[in-house]
A protein has these predicted regions:
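Structured, contiguous alpha/beta core segments that scaffold functional sites
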Residues: 1-252
């Protein structure tokens, strides 16, 4: 007699893609969904140990701060509030593995008028030119929303100050296996950072559900038709997979 057994897939972890993929618009997607930087920020905001480490290490990177020696540079540094801008860069550097600065040239294009921090997660590289150099970046305040138009920003180059008075200085260390984007130094620990987040979600859901255990039910009144079994299996998988399924009770 053939046993009627159904396999219930209660979830398999898939690592977030950080692949560099050429889009139809000519820029390089960061991850298969183009949201890997946003994923890193999500981990920073949801894993307490990771949050504490990133915050403290970013403070150590900043150290005692920065201050130019000559008077003119010091005045510009203070007027641009560069201390605060560089603090933000240090946080980006720790979370993302790189940082970016917006450079604005003066009206006569002879000097730099302002320097400010650009959120690293909002920038995407355009394809390299014949010299294998990135000359432009795309900036969008919300890459998850295709209705938000991305604007072009030229990479920092004083030779093109007249044509492009607003430029971006994109700083990224060498990352093995990557060309356009850096990787954070904790890239090998992402599973463990995510694990801490999921453990917290699992336990808080258990608390909200009165610490009641999740369990399965065996049908004693015969085997349902295949369509009904598939519907039951899909419902169980959707409701009980992952940390959000903790403590849920099924009644039949």
């Amino acid at each position: 007699m053939k046993a009627n057994l159904e396999h219930i897939a209660l979830g398999t972890h898939q690592m977030k893609s950080s692949d560099e993929v050429v889009s139809n618009e000519g820029f390089i997607q960061y991850g298969s969904d183009n949201l890997f930087p946003q994923y890193l920020i999500g981990l920073y905001q949801s894993s307490p140990t990771h949050t504490a480490l990133v915050t403290s290490i970013a403070q150590m990177v900043y150290g005692d701060g920065f201050m130019p020696h000559d008077l003119d540079s010091r005045l510009a540094f203070l007027s641009w509030d560069m201390a605060d801008q560089l603090r933000k860069c240090c946080v980006d550097y720790k979370i993302q593995g790189g940082y970016a600065l917006e450079i604005e040239w003066s009206l006569d294009r002879s000097t730099i008028a302002n320097v400010s921090h650009l959120p690293f997660e909002n920038l995407r590289a355009c394809e390299v030119n014949d010299e294998e150099k990135v000359t432009h970046y795309k900036y969008s305040a919300n890459w998850a929303d295709s209705a938000v138009e991305a604007i072009d920003i030229h990479t920092f180059n004083p030779k093109y100050a007249k044509e492009f008075p607003t430029q971006v200085l994109y700083v990224k260390p060498f990352s093995p296996g990557s060309f356009y984007y850096p990787k954070p130094d904790y890239i090998g620990a992402l599973n463990y950072v995510e694990l801490e987040r999921e453990i917290g979600i699992y336990h808080i859901n258990n608390i909200h559900n009165g610490l009641s255990p999740s369990f399965s039910i065996h049908f004693k009144n015969g085997v349902p038709p295949i369509e009904e079994r598939n519907a039951i299996r899909n419902e169980i998988e959707s409701q009980m997979t992952g940390s959000k399924g903790a403590g849920k009770v099924w009644i039949t």
